[in-house]
């Protein structure tokens, strides 16, 4: 049984799947199969999925929230939101909010700098889907810690952001990270030149000049996150984008209101 206390281990792989690299798996969801040269065996191409998801089989159904029992694999909950590690555990914010984690992508030729998935959870090629719920977050069960989840990879973030809006946000962040960390990017090359000609004083000066004078693209990231969180859409929905710096760029985290235990038909 997986719980929030095991968040740092939140990768779920079935025994029949072949793990090819972090964030991809070989399964029946593969786009196409290919034959290895060594053994002539068919191997599924990698399929991207959210490595932050886990499943939970011991829970109470939404329609009977006081009776906890084991469920079969087809009716296991998919844990798509987690405790808010950015809030103090004794705070009201911790009790009333959750965090949806967007994974990094390593399958698009971008291993040298952080890049996050621009697909809403549940839209990935390797996502777990439910026949009747579609691409909507539908609470199906409640765990012993009082949190509600659905049967699919679709997270509550879909209640607040459309795919288009979400993609715009992630694309903006990815572009900033590319400009910052790309080995042969303009910023890195210029930064090296200035460091050489100033005998190492450039980095010292750059830390002490304001945003308007700094050429560091990461300053743009701080400004973008701050402006996005202050936008009417985010304020009204009571959601927040956590600065990727705070997560060490391991995931792109969205703070959302804690999903409620609503009845489903």
UniProtKB/Swiss-Prot annotation:
Single biological process term from Gene Ontology: protein targeting to membrane
Keywords assigned: Endoplasmic reticulum, Membrane
UniProt xrefs under InterPro entries: Golgin_A_7/ERF4, Ras_palmitoyltransferase
One cellular-component annotation, GO: endoplasmic reticulum membrane
Superkingdom as given in the UniProt entry: Eukaryota
Pfam families listed in its UniProt record: Erf4
UniProt KW Endoplasmic reticulum keyword: yes
Localization annotation: Endoplasmic reticulum membrane
Transmembrane segments: none
Signal peptide (from-to): none
Keyword Endoplasmic reticulum found: yes
Membrane association type: Peripheral membrane protein
Family: Belongs to the ERF4 family.
Role according to the record: The ERF2-ERF4 complex is a palmitoyltransferase specific for Ras proteins. Palmitoylates RAS2, which is required for its proper plasma membrane localization.
PANTHER family: GOLGI AUTOANTIGEN, GOLGIN SUBFAMILY A, 7, GOLGIN SUBFAMILY A MEMBER 7_ERF4 DOMAIN-CONTAINING PROTEIN
Oligomer and partners: Interacts with ERF2.
Stated name of the protein: Ras modification protein ERF4
Source organism phylogeny: Eukaryota, Fungi, Dikarya, Ascomycota, Saccharomycotina
């Amino acid at each position: 049984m997986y719980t929030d206390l095991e968040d740092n281990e939140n990768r779920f792989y079935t025994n029949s799947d072949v793990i090819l690299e972090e964030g991809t798996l070989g399964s029946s969801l593969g786009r196409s199969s290919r034959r290895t040269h060594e053994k002539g065996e068919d191997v599924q191409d990698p399929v991207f999925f959210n490595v932050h998801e886990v499943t939970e089989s011991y829970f109470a159904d939404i329609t009977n929230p006081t009776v906890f029992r084991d469920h079969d694999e087809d009716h296991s909950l998919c844990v798509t939101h987690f405790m808010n590690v950015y809030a103090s555990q004794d705070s009201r914010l911790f009790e009333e909010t959750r965090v949806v984690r967007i994974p990094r992508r390593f399958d698009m030729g971008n291993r040298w700098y952080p890049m996050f998935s621009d697909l809403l959870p549940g839209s990935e090629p390797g996502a777990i889907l439910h026949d009747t719920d579609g691409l909507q977050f539908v609470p199906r069960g409640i765990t012993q810690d009082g949190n509600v989840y659905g049967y699919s990879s679709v997270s509550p973030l879909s209640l607040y952001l459309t795919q288009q809006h979400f993609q715009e946000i992630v694309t903006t962040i990815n572009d900033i990270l590319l400009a910052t960390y790309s080995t042969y990017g303009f910023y890195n090359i210029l930064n090296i030149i200035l460091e050489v000609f100033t005998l190492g004083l450039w980095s010292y000066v750059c830390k002490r000049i304001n945003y308007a004078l700094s050429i560091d693209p990461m300053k743009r990231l701080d400004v973008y996150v701050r402006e996005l969180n202050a936008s009417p859409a985010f304020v009204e929905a009571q959601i927040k984008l956590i600065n990727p710096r705070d997560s060490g760029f391991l995931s792109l985290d969205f703070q959302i209101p804690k999903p409620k235990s609503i009845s489903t038909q």
